């Protein structure tokens, strides 16, 4: 990080929060990030851009599914080739994350994957944060977007991108919270959790299919009656 970076961050803060007429470098400016198909804007594009420029990354999201992995697969594979290391923390909350996606993420040699075990359904895990570090500067996207195709590309999602030095209070607070969750005893490594989680996930899907079938039969009986 150089003094010029500090100057650019100051300009970015002025433009974002004081006067939008200030001339600043967009790479150093806080931004509102959403999906807008009319303008061809996607949250995915912002995340891919930060991934391709960062020295390391950390992600904490409640839900990861197959489509979300597919959206980011080529970018993540490129980072694997370049040796850019990352950490991804998700959860078994509501048993939503798909084992397929978790298997694929864990197969990437540059990524550490953990899952936070929610003991109490009334104390959920619903984070959505993407942290990118480059030359002593953090760019952090926080908001409503999980790692799913709809969240990253089509849903109405609201997110903000923060820009901060490592010494900035905002970056420090967010990084410390990620580290706290990452090191929590309830955060289990992929190898520790995946087989148990797979069984629970498959059982849930079987129950959901049974409920749908029973509902379909009930509707047919109502029509006959």
Identify the residue ranges that each predicted region occupies:
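PLD/PLD-like phosphodiesterase catalytic module centered on the HKD motif
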Residues: 1-225
């Amino acid at each position: 990080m150089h003094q010029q970076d500090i100057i650019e961050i100051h300009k970015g803060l002025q433009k974002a929060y004081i006067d939008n007429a200030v001339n600043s470098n967009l790479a150093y400016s806080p931004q509102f990030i959403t999906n807008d198909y009319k303008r061809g804007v996607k949250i995915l594009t912002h995340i891919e851009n930060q991934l391709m420029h960062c020295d390391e990354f950390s992600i904490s999201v409640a839900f990861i599914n197959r489509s979300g992995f597919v959206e980011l697969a080529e970018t993540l594979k490129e980072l694997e080739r370049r040796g850019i290391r990352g950490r991804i923390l998700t959860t078994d909350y509501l048993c939503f994350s798909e084992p397929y996606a978790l298997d694929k993420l864990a197969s990437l040699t540059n990524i550490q994957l953990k899952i936070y075990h929610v003991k109490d359904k009334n104390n959920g895990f619903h984070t959505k944060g993407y942290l990118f570090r480059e030359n002593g500067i953090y760019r952090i996207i926080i908001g409503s977007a999980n790692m799913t195709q709809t969240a990253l590309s089509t849903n109405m999602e609201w997110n903000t991108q923060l820009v901060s030095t490592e010494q900035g209070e905002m970056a420090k607070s967010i990084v410390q919270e990620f580290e706290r969750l990452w090191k929590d005893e309830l955060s289990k490594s992929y190898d520790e959790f995946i087989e148990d989680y797979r069984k629970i996930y498959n059982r849930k899907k079987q129950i959901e299919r049974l409920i749908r079938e029973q509902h379909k039969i009930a509707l047919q009986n109502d029509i006959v009656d």
